């Protein structure tokens, strides 16, 4: 499975929603709180093509997207593959 990182703040309802989806799918992830750390937010922004909003979700340092994006991908049955969850035949 890929290393999943989610950049969050402690006051973001979309972060809670994104983490809830990952937890529901039993996906292990590393949460990086950028609430009070401008250097971490800048790092996240650089990796997220300039986006400063949270959450931002990455799989093996590759941007997957924000809360809306991961829910859209999940509804389209594409999220598992991007996160490295698909079973090999």
Language-model-derived ranges and their functions:
Residues 1-30:
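Local sequence-structure signature of Cys/Sec-based thiol-disulfide redox active-site neighborhoods
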Residues 23-28, 46-47, 71-72, 81:
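Non-catalytic interaction surface on structured domains
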Residues 30-32, 62:
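Structural signal for short hydrophobic segments within the conserved structured cores
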Residues 34-52, 82-85:
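Thioredoxin-like thiol-disulfide oxidoreductase module
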Residues 49-58, 68:
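Structural micro-motif
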Residues 59-86:
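Non-catalytic, surface beta->alpha helical segment in thiol-disulfide oxidoreductase systems
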């Amino acid at each position: 499975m890929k290393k999943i990182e989610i950049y969050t703040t402690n006051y973001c309802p979309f972060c809670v929603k994104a983490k809830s989806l990952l937890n529901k799918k039993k996906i292990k992830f590393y949460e990086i709180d950028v609430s009070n750390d401008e250097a971490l937010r800048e790092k996240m922004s650089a990796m997220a093509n300039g986006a400063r909003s949270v959450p931002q979700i990455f799989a093996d340092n590759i941007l997957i997207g924000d809360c809306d994006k991961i829910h859209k991908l999940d509804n389209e049955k594409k999220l598992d593959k991007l996160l490295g969850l698909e079973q090999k035949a």
